Amino acid sequence: MKLTFVLIVAVLVLAVCNFTVADKANNAEAPEQEKRACTPNGSYCNILSGKLNCCSGWCLALICAG
């Protein structure tokens, strides 16, 4: 009975530690490339590079719209 209790507590502690580490990993600082300023509306958006860089998130006919 005691062994079962100890095992349950150990599993719960490990689960909490795992969630804490995962949460910190999601909030990690982005690399320098990801910190670039976004492109304002009416400016050229480089959708061909595969990354959308418009502040609004919309690129229509290679122009940022929003």
Swiss-Prot record:
This is Conotoxin Cal6.38. Expressed by the venom duct. Keywords: Disulfide bond, Knottin, Neurotoxin, Secreted, Signal, Toxin. GO terms for molecular function: toxin activity. It is found in: Secreted. Its main location: secreted. Residues 1-22 form the signal peptide. Probable neurotoxin. It comes from Californiconus californicus (California cone). One of its GO terms (cellular component) is extracellular region. Belongs to the conotoxin O1 superfamily.
